């Protein structure tokens, strides 16, 4: 419903200098007049836009002052939601924020659902769906590069590309519809093949967008990087060295790490969701056993596995058991503790055990070899081909799947044209491709999908 007025706390709860209450809807200014008492400008609600007024939020029933505030007024359609919007900046503690929110709710507003402000911005035509989705990506960005990709999407770069693809598909559809409308005309073979070539050209454009979709997803969600190895091989020391802080407990006692430790770090703008696991071994300790099982589960989800070996002992039976678990993954082999002794591990033997692997000698304690490790991880992600300054990244799984489906229908249409199938069947594939592309920007999308997308947003956004 867009005929009611919504309100929510727009900043994180906790102690702070200020907190913001956001209100949007047809009655925002009317409710503001009830609960806000200006210090000077008594006619603050008049037609002027973009005002900030000093005053107090009060309980209109008792006249009690609730908080000293600044009130910002932004009239629709020149606001984020394209509706009348009021934002109240009050003191940032939990109590004043909640008391201000409660008095607004008692005077006619409804508590906003998660993402409802952004949803209204989309429904009112202020943003398209891809742009609206980028807002949550900006909020959740783990690196400067991830934020840059999201800002580009908010600015409409992806939408512009998708709209262009839709326009071209519509042009092809018009040509096919003309054939359907005039079946008595003999259509030259080269005309049909020409339309097929245009389909193939669009397919190549979509393939180009999809080529870096997995990389885009990594920038958005982080590269799931799991550190594995037998107990006491230096996994926790490696985590601490990469984070440049003592995040994990390090002792000489095997099995110190009994649970999974997860942190986010940035390597040249690439976010790593790095996970230190319990040492993989058979154990009777119940807590450690649970940690080992969780480690095995995480291995199945890993984008990259950092397999740590001990340079002082060579490859043990425990190491071979770990290798059996990771041999089908993308693995970096890290030979640790090279500062203590000469490396006793035969790299040729390792390569026989794991087909794809890069071997890097490190000392987690002395931070030797970490620069090479970081460079290798970065190159594995971007393959030396990508900068995020102006690139159009498909970082959202929903967008990726939509492009794949749209491309599949174009492939079917192209194949049908080459095989001279009836034009109305080709038309079905082209229409499907056009509609699926519209799902990305919201040109053709169901209400259920809209609700599902915005439910993932935070309240107040």
UniProtKB/Swiss-Prot annotation:
Belongs to the TRAFAC class TrmE-Era-EngA-EngB-Septin-like GTPase superfamily. TrmE GTPase family. Homodimer. Heterotetramer of two MnmE and two MnmG subunits. It comes from the Bacteria. GO terms for molecular function: GTP binding; GTPase activity; metal ion binding. Its EC number is 3.6.-.-. Its cofactor is K(+). GTP binds at residues 232-237, 251-257, 276-279. This is tRNA modification GTPase MnmE. (6S)-5-formyl-5,6,7,8-tetrahydrofolate binds at residues 22, 87, 126, 461. One of its GO terms (cellular component) is cytosol. It is found in: Cytoplasm. GO terms for biological process: tRNA methylation; tRNA wobble uridine modification. Keywords: Cytoplasm, GTP-binding, Hydrolase, Magnesium, Metal-binding, Nucleotide-binding, Potassium, tRNA processing. Binds 1 potassium ion per subunit. K(+) binds at residues 232, 251, 253, 256. It is an enzyme of class 3 (hydrolase).
């Amino acid at each position: 419903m867009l005929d009611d007025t919504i309100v929510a706390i727009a900043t994180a709860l906790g102690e702070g200098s200020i907190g913001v209450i956001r209100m949007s809807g047809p009655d925002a200014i009317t409710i503001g007049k009830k609960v806000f008492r200006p210090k000077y400008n008594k006619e603050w609600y008049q037609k002027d836009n973009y005002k900030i007024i000093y005053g107090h939020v009060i309980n209109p029933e008792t006249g009690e002052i609730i908080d000293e505030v600044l009130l910002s007024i932004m009239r629709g359609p020149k606001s984020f939601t394209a509706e009348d919007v009021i934002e109240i900046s009050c003191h940032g503690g939990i109590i004043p924020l909640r008391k201000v929110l409660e008095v607004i709710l008692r005077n006619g507003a409804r508590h906003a659902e998660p993402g409802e402000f952004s949803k209204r911005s989309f429904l009112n035509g202020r943003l398209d769906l891809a742009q609206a989705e980028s807002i949550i990506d900006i909020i959740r960005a783990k690196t400067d590069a991830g934020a840059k990709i999201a800002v580009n999407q908010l600015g409409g770069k992806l939408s512009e590309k998708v709209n262009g693809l839709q326009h071209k598909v519509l042009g092809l559809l018009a040509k096919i519809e003309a054939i359907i409308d005039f079946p008595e005309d003999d259509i030259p073979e080269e005309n049909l093949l020409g339309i097929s070539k245009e389909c193939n050209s669009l397919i190549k454009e979509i393939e180009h967008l999809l080529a870096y979709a997995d990389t885009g997803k990594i920038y958005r969600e982080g590269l799931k990087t799991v550190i594995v190895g037998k107990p006491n091989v230096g996994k926790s020391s490696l985590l601490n060295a990469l984070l440049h802080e003592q995040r994990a407990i390090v002792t000489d006692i095997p099995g110190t790490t009994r649970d999974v430790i997860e942190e986010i770090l940035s390597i040249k703008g690439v976010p790593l969701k790095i996970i230190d696991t319990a040492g993989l071994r058979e154990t009777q300790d119940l807590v450690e056993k649970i940690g080992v099982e969780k480690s095995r589960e995480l291995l199945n989800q890993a984008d990259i596995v950092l397999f740590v070996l001990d340079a002082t002992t060579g490859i043990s039976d425990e190491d071979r058991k770990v290798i059996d678990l990771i041999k089908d993954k993308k693995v970096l082999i890290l030979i640790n503790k090279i500062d203590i002794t000469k490396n006793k591990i035969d790299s040729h033997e390792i390569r026989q055990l794991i087909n794809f692997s890069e071997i890097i000698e490190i000392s987690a304690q002395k931070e030797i070899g970490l620069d090479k490790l970081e460079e290798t991880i970065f190159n594995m992600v971007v393959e030396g081909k990508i900068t995020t300054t102006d690139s159009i990244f498909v970082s959202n799984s929903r967008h990726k799947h939509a492009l794949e489906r749209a491309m599949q229908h174009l492939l079917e249409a192209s194949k049908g044209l080459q095989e001279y199938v009836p034009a109305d069947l080709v038309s079905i594939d082209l229409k499907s491709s056009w509609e699926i592309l519209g799902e990305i920007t919201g040109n053709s999308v169901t209400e259920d999908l809209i609700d599902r997308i915005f439910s993932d947003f935070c309240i107040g956004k």
